[in-house]
Amino acid sequence: MSSSSPNPFRRSLKFVEQWYRETPQRALDGAYEAARAIEEIEKKHFKGQPVPLRIRTESVMTNYFQSEVQKNLQFIQTRLREFKSSSLVVEVADKLKPPSIPPAPTPLDTPNTIDFTDEYDVTSEEYSSELVSPSIDAQGSLDKLAFIDAVLKRYRSASIQREAAAAASKAARASAPKSGSEMKKNIPQPLPIQSAQNSLYESEFISDDITEDPSKLDSSSFIPRSILRTATRFRKELNPDPGTEDDILNDFRNSRVRTRAAVSFVLGLMIVPLLTQQVSKNLVIGPFVDKLKGPEQIEIRINPEIENEVLTELARFEERLKFESLTSPIPLSPAEIQFQLKAKAEDLKEEYQWDLRQPLKNAISDLFSLVALAIYFVLNRQKIAVLKSFFDEIIYGLSDSAKAFIIILFTDVFVGFHSPHGWEVIVESVLSHFGLPQDRNFINMFIATFPVMLDTVFKYWIFRYLNQISPSAVATYRNMNE
């Protein structure tokens, strides 16, 4: 019976291998069916045009089709990733597969032996031929990929989506009632960036740029930006096109959505690392580190200040006992003094055990918070661009005096005359957080070099960028600094 035991296991392995080899075609078929579903929605309900994902109306049908298209787009991307990864694994496995070795002949004259090998065993050539389905052809796969790419292209292109949104907006205005409240109700509204009630996947297909020219904020111009913005505002206000009001409303809604997205992203930057650090430290890392034996001894050797603190307090307690023994009418015996010193030493050990293990907990929990912050950045990549544009709008919207005031405030705080005291507190806090010794030479060297380098970076930024973007702000900064 021992010879038959490997055969079911081998058959299970072959079944799993065959199933995984069919994964690329299965994933491609799933993506193809989702793309066909999107095309059916376009043909039946949008006259063959792409579904406008950049607008939101009060129409329940339109919102339903938008959510269906977004769901299918997300499903297509998931299946395409599965198709690429599984195809790569199958290709690498085929290249690394060793040549087949024919099995050794089984003696037929052995008594009381049942031969199960012919029932399940197949050669590698027969197995490979079984895995390759005759219905799967390369040309069919290429046709499906081309069809999927054509569908995705209609939703990756921002220009196509703008045309679809404009067409939907015109259709809504043409069919809207004449009353002002109902017209305002039927005006298509822009979808919020990664809003909670809509699919987060929309941002991967639509280039929802803040401006038509991303480099406009970073380039210098002979004409001041305030004059250009005022001229653009007058041009929009004097434009007789009835669609201008819709554009202004859409711009306002987009600006409001960007502000909310930027504020939520900044709050997430503060809350996610802090919450991860505290939760992991108190619920995961803390109980694990408390069970370890001897980390406090390692910490004492690394940080002699902790050892000195313990010994100083114990010596102070011993001196207090001797003083009380000398001033008391009934002096303490040496045995009683030794007993109280031993009890105090045990209390100090229990008291400082928590502090001695804190640096290890802090280091591991900080690593967890960094990982959580990296994941947060990866999941909110589009909001980084939104945050940059939000800060650009705020900074460029300030007056020259306000810009100069902010620059002077930051430079005086970080690289000013009194900044070494603040840097000393920061460095000592960081060293204490990780349980490192507070070496005065290292602290003085850091304070003598890092603020100088930071001051150089500030001056280079003012000379290289701010002088081109806002020369008047630089002039105001120099006058205020003098």
From Swiss-Prot:
One cellular component term from this protein's GO annotations in UniProt: plasma membrane
Membrane topology label: Multi-pass membrane protein
Record field: transmembrane: 265-285, 359-379, 406-426, 442-462
Record key words, sorted: Cell inner membrane, Cell membrane, Hydrogen ion transport, Ion transport, Membrane, Transmembrane, Transmembrane helix, Transport
Subcellular location, record wording: Cell inner membrane
Listed InterPro entries: CemA (IPR004282)
Molecular function per GO: proton transmembrane transporter activity
Keyword hit for Transmembrane helix: yes
Family, as annotated: Belongs to the CemA family.
NCBIfam families: PRK02507.1-5
Purpose of the protein: Required for H(+) efflux immediately after light irradiation to form a rapid H(+) concentration gradient across the thylakoid membranes. Together with PxcL, contributes to transient H(+) uptake following dark to light transition.
Name this protein carries in UniProt: Proton extrusion protein PxcA
Protein source organism: Acaryochloris marina (strain MBIC 11017)
